[in-house]
Regions:
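Core nucleic-acid recognition elements
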Residues: 1-434, 438-466, 474, 479-483, ...
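Conserved NAD(P)+-binding/catalytic subdomain of aldehyde/semialdehyde dehydrogenases
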Residues: 469
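Catalytic PLP-binding core of fold-type I/II PLP enzymes
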Residues: 490-493
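Structural signature of cysteine-dependent C-C bond-forming condensing enzymes
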Residues: 497-501
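A structural-propensity feature for long, helix-poor, extended segments
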Residues: 510-516, 522-525
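Repeat-solenoid scaffold signature
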Residues: 526-545
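Short alpha-helical "recognition helix" segments of helix-turn-helix
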Residues: 599
Length: 599
């Protein structure tokens, strides 16, 4: 029996003001409306349909669109999962799945697609009847293997095609490793290795030794940074080995909900987490989402400090090239000379602060200040911007030190489902930028869902309220490289191995290959370990907070990363091979005396 799908028409997508802002006075859009598509599991009754219409502020469709933008084929949008959750809670049982489309009657489709279409998360159609395809089951992509142990030159091609950003030393290391193992490498192992060993994750430039023609008294840039901490250790409780630093607070307190569901002041010692990080590459490609997910990642860094902490306030900063606000250039400005795939400094300045502030606000944390500055000299400048996301939080003194997990402990993935977004973000942000890899760059930009992060934080807060009885032994946020970086890092830090079953991990995209499931950078996720006997308590909290979680696998005594998906062995690598000591490059810095113009 064919699936029954009904369509309802909702409100306008854009206000008239927003439409002019996006498309100008000569907008190609004649009509723009949200369309709600519902796949029914049985015949919907009249009173149930009226309840649906009231919830969605919708009615029968009144126009015929010639452009419909939907979630990408094979995926379920975050809006859909939230809406279905609401339908379930108010007793609507006939709707199997609900999706929201952007529907237009347009004069010029291409103009609308350029401004309103995200090719990583959306598909587009010319008629409503064609959109029924998104409710059909799609075929999953397969695991791919490459015989680099037989052909050492193959890795050069893969490095370029997959955007791995491996240097010659790393390629030689991989070739030698798989010749020793005498087997092919999987695409998941390649992508995982490239993320874990990217500049973004391993900070190779900061850890390398520099040769300079001016005095430099430290072995590396990291040593220079750390030397400032050594001068005042009295107030620093934790630095450089966790997701954020912890400094001594002066009589701070923490309001929390007790076991009786009443607010109370925590009476123990409370200290302060502090963190800044950058999210440059994504902000340069897509300023709003790049800055939003930059702030989201910094929030997760705070939460995943020690055994759990609570974010309190955030801030952001931007360093960009000259703004060129009008056709009349200022005395210090020349004609723009940036790569085509990067957003303009003007667009970054307008969109990035809104993205960061929006994420903070929707999560429920104030963004309290920020800064921006410009720098450009001849052909050099912040064409690729610096986007700095920072924040402070509160942490109980008893939670500052991470616990000691044991073999057999459950490995939990908490938060939103896996989606094909942000693939290869660690290596993309670490590679040389050209117009040739613009599609790979766009694929590496994450998409934000601050509501899901708030749900995850509510779960962590419940464990935080248990203070010394918090069952979480070790926690990492999921950032660059996704769980393919977070879970191996957790294994390395705990000196244990891990066995993961990818089938267990929540996914909103049924077409994703094992590599994509393992390596995507879907946001708003954490990985942590917890004794198996405490999983029931976690389940109860997650149900109350409506936050998804998966028991992804178990810690093992054998220091090996083993990842399976049905009958596929996706990853099988020893920790020593994955985190091998790869020689760092020697870097050279030369001093230049710049002749600056007077204005």
């Amino acid at each position: 029996m064919s699936q029954k799908i009904i369509f309802l028409e909702g409100d306008n997508i854009f206000t008239s003001t927003k439409q002019v802002k996006i498309f100008g006075q000569n907008s190609p859009i004649k009509v723009n409306k949200y369309i709600f598509a519902m796949s029914l599991c049985n015949e919907i009754k009249k009173d149930e349909l009226e309840k649906v219409k009231a919830l969605l502020s919708a009615h029968e469709t009144t126009f015929t669109p010639n452009l419909i933008i939907t979630p990408r084929l094979g995926t379920q949008s975050s809006w859909s999962s939230k809406a279905q959750d609401i339908f379930k809670n108010v007793g609507i049982k006939s709707v199997q799945r609900l999706e929201r489309f952007k529907a237009f009657d347009v004069k010029d489709k291409e103009k609308v697609l350029i401004k309103s279409f995200d090719k990583m998360t959306e598909s587009h159609f010319s008629s409503l009847s064609d959109t029924k395809k998104i409710f059909q089951e799609a075929q999953r992509k397969k695991l791919i293997t490459y015989a680099i142990h037989e052909d050492s030159t193959l890795l050069d091609k893969l490095n370029n095609d997959l955007g791995l950003a491996l240097n010659d030393v790393e390629k030689a290391y991989l070739n030698k490793l798989f010749q020793k193992l005498n087997r092919s490498v999987t695409d998941a192992e390649l992508m995982m290795f490239s993320q874990i060993n990217s500049e973004h994750c391993r900070h190779k430039i900061f850890r390398s030794k520099w040769k300079t023609d001016i005095p430099f008294s430290h072995d590396s840039l990291f040593e220079a940074i750390k030397s400032t901490t050594k001068k005042d250790m009295e107030h620093i409780l934790s630095a450089y080995h966790d997701n954020s630093a912890v400094i001594k607070a002066n009589g701070a307190s923490m309001l929390e909900v007790g076991g009786d569901d009443k607010y109370k002041n925590y009476k123990g010692e409370v200290d302060t987490t502090i963190k800044v990080e950058t999210h440059n590459h994504p902000t340069g490609i897509s300023p709003f989402e790049g800055a939003a997910t930059g702030s989201g990642g910094e929030i997760r860094d705070c939460s995943a400090t020690g055994r759990v902490a609570r974010p309190k306030a955030g801030f952001m900063g931007l360093c960009i090239s000259h703004l060129r606000l009008s056709n009349e250039l200022e005395a210090w400005e020349d004609k723009e000379n940036k790569p085509d795939f990067l957003a303009s400094p003007r667009d970054i300045l307008i969109e990035a602060p809104i993205g960061s502030a929006a994420y903070n606000n929707e999560f429920g944390r104030p963004a309290i200040f920020g800064y921006f500055r410009t720098l450009e000299y001849q052909d050099l400048g912040f064409h690729k911007p610096i986007m700095l996301a920072g924040g402070i939080g509160s942490i109980k003194e008893v939670q500052i030190k991470k616990g000691i997990p044991k073999p057999g402990d459950a490995v939990i993935v908490l938060g939103g489902p896996a989606m094909l977004i942000g693939l290869g973000g660690g290596s993309a942000s670490s590679s040389k930028k050209t117009n040739d890899n613009a599609d790979l760059d766009f694929a590496s930009v994450q998409r934000s869902n601050p509501e899901m992060q708030r749900r995850a934080q509510q779960v962590l807060d419940k464990f935080n309220e248990r203070s010394s009885k918090n069952p979480i032994t070790f926690i990492h946020d999921v950032g660059a490289g996704g769980i393919s970086n977070a879970i191996p890092e957790l294994a390395k830090d705990t000196n244990l191995g891990v066995e993961i079953n990818l089938e267990k991990i929540d996914s909103a995209d049924q077409t994703m290959s094992p590599m994509e499931l393992w390596c995507n950078e879907s946001q708003e996720r954490y990985v942590f370990t917890i004794p198996m006997k405490k999983v029931r308590a976690l389940e109860n909290i997650c149900r109350k907070e409506r936050c998804p979680f998966s028991i992804a696998g178990l810690l093992t005594e054998e220091k090996v990363i083993k990842i399976k998906f049905h009958d596929d062995e996706v990853v099988n690598l020893h920790l020593d091979d994955l985190f091998g000591e790869i020689p760092l490059p020697d870097l050279i810095a030369q001093y230049y005396d710049l002749s600056l113009i007077h204005i």
